[in-house]
Amino acid sequence: FWAAYLIFIGVMLSFAFEDIFPSMEPYHIMNQGLIYLLILDFLLRFMLQPAMSQEIKPYLLMPIKKNKLVDTLLLQSGISSYNFFWFFLIVPFALLTIIRFYGFTGILCYLCGIWLLMAMNSYWYLICKTLLNEKLLYILLPIGVYGLLAGTEFIPEGNPVSTFMMNLGEGFIEGNILSFLGVIAAILLLLLVNLSLIHISEPTRHSLIS
């Protein structure tokens, strides 16, 4: 049901953006909205993505060190099938808007970039979820981050956040290596933060494996 719904939205957005913003390409508008897609994805993960404590329970009786098990599950979260969920929206949109300028190569590069953004979002979600398992007060972290992004977007002129996302998305389409390396660097940083939280914080470790 959700797949068909997202495919329909992806198709309709390609035509709607072309009609509403005739001076811009539809994929420019989509890229500007990627920040909102990431926020929506973050919120949906709390409802759809299982907590690590649930994922780890089936393996607790196996002769595997818990630390290594947690490390493995963290790495697997980067290639989780959930990170491809939004492809149902992006693929039909890209086929109708990107292919005529950049061909299938542009679409493949774009999809790789979107996947990296979703993997990055997954590790950001895990940081917030891990901290929330310790103290509910940590809900202020995502609220503060998204509040800062909103202030950066709407207070100055030029909408710098959506403009940055538009340029990043176009970098993906064009196969700009710096665009990919920037997101990969962010993923590695978030992964290291996750590992540090789990291995250093004893209460967090118990909340994950109990």
Q: Where would I find each of the regions flagged by the language model?
A:
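Hydrophobic alpha-helical transmembrane segments of membrane proteins
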Residues: F1-I56, K66-R205, S210
